[in-house]
Amino acid sequence: MFSISHPGDFESLKIIVNEINKLRKINKKLKKESFEVYVGFPEFVGTGRATLYKPNFEDLAKQVNYAKKHNVRFEVVINASCIGGMHLTPKGISYINWIFSQLKNIGVDSVALSDPYLVDLAKNNGLEVNVSCIALVDSLDKALFWDEKEVYAITLDSSINRHFDIIQEIRENVSCKLKILVNEACLYKCPMRIQHFNFFSHANAQNIPALDDYYYNKCINLRIKKKELIIKSPFIRPEDLKYYKGLVDIFKISGRSHPIGWIKRVINAYLNERWDGNLMELLDCPRELEHFYYLDNRALDGAIEYWKSCNKLCSKCNFCKELAEKALKVKY
């Protein structure tokens, strides 16, 4: 299955569904493939990403019906990393239960959540739950915790995308579906990840007038200083999806804060499992890096064979640094 980012407005959904149907006709391998779209719902509770459009329940209901007519699952993302404890107050519990009951009534297929208590509330309301990547599931112990809650799926922390041994161990010991982010290009083991998620969670829910995004700017700065950090980002190239088939069930395309034209480009590349050109154009990372760097996707052919057995002891290895010199060029 492919899980595709959706900016939230009805017109974008139509474009995504049309693109899926078009590719199904062209590519015979996709005729039996399953699809879902996921959309942020930042109202009050918040999400862990920037949000372009905030659909209301009436809008969501229309979109859910449209998606189902085209055999596309519809997932709503309510994955704030922090909601200030309001979900543990009587008023908060009542309000969240009301939200979940509304989502159930309009036919949403699943909700993506990162908080264990919200998972319990959602399941009590009859909703299927996908554990968000913001839950940072990067070990078997964490995966078992969520699997015991009988969730529909777990989205693995992208930091283990190239740790095939960990993914294999999780696959062999959980019964739920596993979902993996394919084009997220955050820093490997980013030390600012949870703080950045917290920032978005509060900014989306409370409309905080932030002066600037420190974490975003620092992310850019670090990768201009050390370009090998881009190579070390745990992205999965379209051509390398085949290495994950059998290990995971769902390939998640990140980027719901991007314009629909960008999303269409990424859909085409990953569904066709091929991209010739600048890989930066597919990666969900600061746009400034795309404009600054050219990452030759063909120069990365075969790199995954090394990454599959890499022990990630970077101080004793220069593979990514040497690959960056070969594949990654400054445009200007």
From Swiss-Prot:
Protein transport as a keyword of this entry, yes or no, is: no
Under which EC number(s) is this enzyme classified? 3.4.-.-
- Annotated S-S bridges: none
Q: Which InterPro entries match?
A: Peptidase_U32, RNA/ubiquinone_mod_enzymes
What processes in GO biological process is this protein linked to?
biosynthetic process; proteolysis
At the top level, the lineage of the source is Archaea
| Record carries keyword Hydrolase | yes
Keywords, ordered alphabetically: Hydrolase, Protease
**A molecular function GO annotation:** peptidase activity
Q: Which family does it belong to?
A: Belongs to the peptidase U32 family.
Query: What name does this protein carry?
Result: Uncharacterized protease MJ1657
UniProt organism field:
Methanocaldococcus jannaschii (strain ATCC 43067 / DSM 2661 / JAL-1 / JCM 10045 / NBRC 100440) (Methanococcus jannaschii)
The organism's taxonomic lineage, starting at the top: Archaea, Methanobacteriati, Methanobacteriota, Methanomada group, Methanococci
